[in-house]
Amino acid sequence: MMKQTPVNEIPNLEVLNLIPGGSKRIVEAGSSSGVLAREYKKLHADCHYTGIEVDAEYAELSRRYCDVVLHASIENLDDRAFDGLFPADCWIFADVLEHLVDPWSVLRRIRSRISAGASIVACLPNVQHWSMQANINRGHFVYEDSGLLDRTHLRWFTRLSMADLFQSTGFRVAEGAGRIYSHMEPGAKIRAAIQTMAEATGANAEVAVNDALAFQWVVRAVPA
């Protein structure tokens, strides 16, 4: 099996900050090395944290911080195992949904069981990022070991299609923002080119530039 994004020990603080503070039961799909569990449990030691991790090595690392770890793909859990994850106050998909064959089915499956006050916190790569647009413009589309062109990505999302992913599965995006890295800001010529393309296609130029700045989208969705 092809290895997913290389493990690291740096938590996604934007995801951490979107987890409702009162969450007593959390399920994280793709718990990797367990660093998000580590950081959340520093603040909320009484939380019961379940990790689901498809990679055996990462699953073992997750056990350092998670109360329970399932070595499995969330897409392959049978009904008994899936039902055992409920109730949960928050589900986390930090750089995971893009790796799934059918993220729509996974979200619908959660929606059919989730309580009204629960949340989903997700981080998804932005295929509309200016670097992607620039590379596609010159015919450069080469898969890599990590990043926007991670070779294990199966799905691609813009801000609008990310919102549609949740809306079409019974959720609505309650809050969120783009992850913008200052060292990856586009130059004036790139910005102008994005504005020109937006205007040529009848889109809002300012929105197009703003959407191109986000490397990833980090959002919290709730049942609609």
PLM ranges: what are they?
Residues 104-119:
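A short glycine-rich, Lys/Arg-flanked "PGG" loop and its adjoining helix->strand segment in the class I
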Residues 144-161:
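Acceptor-substrate binding/catalytic loop of class I
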